[in-house]
From Swiss-Prot:
GO terms for biological process: defense response to virus; maintenance of CRISPR repeat elements. If the spacer DNA has a perfect match in the chromosome then toxicity results. Suppression of the toxic effects occurs via mutations in the CRISPR/Cas machinery, or via target deletion, which might contribute to genome plasticity. This CRISPR/Cas system can be used to remove genomic islands, and possibly other genomic regions. Signal peptide: none annotated. The lineage of its organism: Bacteria, Pseudomonadati, Pseudomonadota, Gammaproteobacteria, Enterobacterales. InterPro entries: CRISPR-assoc_prot_Csy4, CRISPR-Cas6/Csy4_sf. The gene is cas6f. This is CRISPR-associated endonuclease Cas6f/Csy4. The keyword RNA-binding applies. It comes from Pectobacterium atrosepticum (strain SCRI 1043 / ATCC BAA-672) (Erwinia carotovora subsp. atroseptica). Keywords: Antiviral defense, Endonuclease, Hydrolase, Nuclease, RNA-binding. Its EC number is 3.1.-.-. Homodimer. Part of the probable Csy ribonucleoprotein complex with cys1, cys2, csy3, cas6f and crRNA. Belongs to the CRISPR-associated endoribonuclease Cas6 family. Cas6f/Csy4, subtype I-F/Ypest subfamily. Induction: Expressed in late exponential phase (other phases not tested); part of a large cas-CRISPR3 polycistronic operon.
C-alpha cells in the first residue's frame, strides 16, 4: 500500500457526480474481481454525507500498474481525471474502508422466509413488520447486479484513524473489514 491513484469524476449536464461514481465503482468492481487478487484497496478522500467526487486506489506500484494497463475505464475516460501513480506521503494515518450490509427490506425478508420454507406467507406477514427495516446514514454507491439485474446499494464506512497499517486482503469492491489503507 505504498502507492495510490486518484480518480476524480467530472460531472456535466448529462451525468451527475453520483451517477458517474456509481458507474466508476461498478467497472472497478468487475476488474478487481478478475485481476487484483485482493491487493488493491480503495478510499474516498472527500467522504462526508456522500462519497464525494474522488475515488482513491491504493496498492503497490506493480498492482496499480497492472490495473492501469487494462482498458477498465473505457467509456468513462471523458468523465474522469486520473492522476499518475504516486508514492503515499510520509507520516500518514491508516483506516479501514469497509462495506456495511443492512438487512433492510421487510418485504425481501418476508419473501426469503417463505422461499426457504421457514414461514408461510401469512406467518411472514405477521412476524416481519415494516418496522424491522433499517436505514443507514452511511454514504453509498448504487450498482446493478450482473447475476440478477437488480440495483442495490453498497454502503461504505470509513473506520477510525489508526497509527499503523494492518495487512489483509481486499474484496472485489476494494473494501476490507481488517486491511487498512493510508489516509491523507
Amino acid at each position: 500500500m505504498d502507492h495510490y491513484i486518484d480518480i476524480r469524476v467530472q460531472p456535466d449536464p448529462e451525468f451527475t457526480a453520483s451517477q458517474l461514481l456509481n458507474a466508476l465503482f461498478a467497472k472497478l468492481h468487475r476488474v478487481l474481481g478478475q485481476l487484483a487478487n485482493g491487493k488493491i484497496g480503495i478510499s474516498f478522500p472527500e467522504v462526508g454525507k456522500t462519497l464525494g467526487e474522488c475515488l482513491r486506489l491504493h496498492g503497490t506500484e506493480d498492482a496499480l500498474s497492472t490495473l492501469e494497463k487494462t482498458s477498465w475505464l473505457k467509456g468513462l475516460r471523458d468523465y474522469t481525471q486520473v492522476s499518475e501513480c504516486k508514492v503515499v506521503p510520509n507520516g500518514v494515518k491508516f483506516r479501514t474502508v469497509r462495506r456495511v450490509q443492512l438487512k433492510s427490506s421487510a418485504e425481501r425478508l418476508r419473501r426469503r422466509s417463505v422461499s426457504k420454507g421457514w414461514l408461510t406467507a401469512a406467518e411472514a406477514a405477521a412476524r416481519i413488520p415494516d418496522a424491522v427495516e433499517k436505514r443507514s446514514a452511511l454514504p453509498f454507491v448504487q450498482i446493478k447486479s450482473l447475476s440478477n439485474g437488480q440495483m442495490f446499494f453498497v454502503f461504505v464506512e470509513h473506520g477510525p484513524l489508526q497509527n499503523a497499517p494492518t495487512a489483509g486482503r481486499f474484496s472485489s469492491y476494494g473494501l476490507s473489514t481488517e486491511a487498512t489503507v493510508p489516509w491523507f
